[in-house]
Amino acid sequence: MSQSKADYINVIGAGLAGSEAAYQIAKRGIPVKLYEMRGVKATPQHKTTNFAELVCSNSFRGDSLTNAVGLLKEEMRRLDSIIMRNGEAHRVPAGGAMAVDREGYAEAVTAEIESHPLIEVIRKEITEIPDDAITVIASGPLTSDALAEKIHELNGGDGFYFYDAAAPIVDKATIDMNKVYLKSRYDKGEAAYLNCPMTKEEFMAFYEALTTAEEAPLNSFEKEKYFEGCMPIEVMAKRGIKTMLYGPMKPVGLEYPEDYMGPRDGDFKTPYAVVQLRQDNAAGSLYNIVGFQTHLKWGEQKRVFQMIPGLENAEFVRYGVMHRNSYMDSPNLLKQTFQSKSNPNLFFAGQMTGVEGYVESAASGLVAGINAARLFKGEDEVIFPHTTAIGSLPYYVTHAESKHFQPMNVNFGIIKELEGPRIRDKKERYEKIAERALKDLQTFIDA
């Protein structure tokens, strides 16, 4: 155990992880200096200066406890996550998923943090790793070059990276509603998605256009390394037609409504392929194209995506873009507390640690913030149970094989297995894992 003599803790970056870390520290009665460069220096992806901005999708993904990210969200709610609380307050319809009005949510997080009496917000770019106090670095995958260089020095000069992309957003008023229908897959939850059905002929023409469209160039010295969970649609398409039909354009569970009058293949009750649109703001005026992260040139996006039935005259309020994400060699550099092995006063959180996804990033900030606060108070740091979703993430990123380490979403495969004979039914098995996780988390909280 080591601790600083300073009477505050630094948090660098006010994204999901940094906002969560700052809140967790401050609620434990410790002053925080929260540094955020947006407002002074922009990033390629962020559109506002709000904290915890969502730059890719507006979805926090599945809400069911039989979904690992649903379990993680419930654990975070029980740990008083500022991200989850404000996300809940700004939900928009998304069937069985949790999606938010991205502007209202980010504005609420920003207002709560800026008004907190123990959090001092400093709009400034940090170019060196501070040594004046316990510090949580949560500068994100878009960390500025100067600070990224210092972090890479901790990596022994090695920088890991991958690319991910954001999906386009369209103005609902410009969608041809006669060609689409409202439905959630398998009718789960409320009918929350606009579905753009395709016949086989329409799909094949779209597929041909997508796979031959011109992509925006990458730097010539960088390989195209993508995170599977946010892969550009054109890259996915080049893997083959079935990748699309079993992936983002899967038609199963999205049968035509009885009053559907558009084109279809014969008497089939289900389209050959479906493109889904998900509500992106509380007003319901914007919709994003689900799973259509892309790196196509903007003119090509307009040409190809207007081939989607219902989007022939759609106005794109934001085109899809791709950005480079950097992450650390966490298995060699970090403890399960998200603490540096070489400097106990230094913590890291967010996607740079190798957790992937909004919820996972916020969860890492929660863990790092709690442990930074405990270190400040002279208490032992805590390791969350491996039987929980929030404990499985730091376990994974610090125990993975360094040579093949890549960012990871939360999933039941990284949570400690149940004891006893394996339960064959997947839903029942996941229910038991979730039940054990919440029980163990409560025991951990009460200890």
Swiss-Prot record:
Major subcellular location class: cytoplasm
GO cellular component: a single term: cytosol
Binding, FAD: 13-18
Keywords for the protein's UniProt record, in alphabetical order: Cytoplasm, FAD, Flavoprotein, Methyltransferase, NAD, NADP, Transferase, tRNA processing
GO BP field: tRNA methylation; tRNA wobble uridine modification
Cofactor dependency: FAD
Chaperone found in the keyword field: no
EC number: 2.1.1.74
GO molecular function, one term: tRNA (uracil(54)-C5)-methyltransferase activity, 5,10-methylenetetrahydrofolate-dependent
Localization per Swiss-Prot or TrEMBL: Cytoplasm
Domain of life: Bacteria
Reactions this protein catalyses: uridine(54) in tRNA + (6R)-5,10-methylene-5,6,7,8-tetrahydrofolate + NADH + H(+) = 5-methyluridine(54) in tRNA + (6S)-5,6,7,8-tetrahydrofolate + NAD(+); uridine(54) in tRNA + (6R)-5,10-methylene-5,6,7,8-tetrahydrofolate + NADPH + H(+) = 5-methyluridine(54) in tRNA + (6S)-5,6,7,8-tetrahydrofolate + NADP(+)
Short name of one Pfam family: GIDA
Family the UniProt entry places it in: Belongs to the MnmG family. TrmFO subfamily.
Purpose: Catalyzes the folate-dependent formation of 5-methyl-uridine at position 54 (M-5-U54) in all tRNAs.
Name of the protein this chain belongs to: Methylenetetrahydrofolate--tRNA-(uracil-5-)-methyltransferase TrmFO
